[in-house]
Amino acid sequence: VPRTNIVTGRAFNRISFYGARGAFLEQIQMFAGPTVIWRYDQFGNDPLEGSESFDLSLTARGGWRLSGHAEHDYTDIQNGDYAAYTVDRGAGQVPYAPLSSVEDGFLFSSTLTTPTWQTANASAKISRSRGVIFPEGSAGFETRLTGSLALRPTSSIRIAYSQTFSRIRRDRDGSEFA
């Protein structure tokens, strides 16, 4: 979803090491850096959200790749975004009060990717994260499994399949959000 009326600041650094041709470990890459997002009219003040991340990618002989990602996230939840929300606390409708922020969000993921062979390639990813559930202004945990398979049985036929399983649970009581 394109976002408007924001300013994004991002910096990163990459470090790469290369093994000898034919070595078991042919390449190691690391990326790290922060990302900060402000509302346009509040640029330079407290950010709306941001993260610090670290990525590590290992490429083995034959093109096999194992990647890992770690990230710390923080989000300032804007109460005005939930002004029309109400909840029934037993005595009628009252205004909904979202969390003010989620300061301790995180994301950890690992991906295994096969080489690109003449007729096929595949990948599998598992991730675990904690962050904002934006539709209700609360915090939650997500577990996600993703897989993809691409087949090229002939020079003119391509078949692609992908599947994602995602489970989001609310932080406050462990109930399922999605």
State the predicted function of each range:
Residues V1-A178:
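Exposed, low-structure sequence patches enriched in small/polar residues
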